[in-house]
């Protein structure tokens, strides 16, 4: 196995992780929307979900940056 194969395997693992994180991010968005539509929304729970959603977004961006090489123009 050479470095390219290891890099490809790593990229595939990152892509899988990204897909999982994106799905969880979307699910949290749906949950927040559903909670906000309730007559008496639980603002503490909504805030917790939003913080988790933001943390997921940060991780998604970090992983996307790993996949994209830095290109200096």
Question: Where are the regions a protein language model picked out?
Answer:
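Short, charge-rich amphipathic alpha-helices with coiled-coil/heptad character
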Residues: 1-8, 29
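Amphipathic, hydrophobic secondary-structure cores in small proteins
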Residues: 11-73
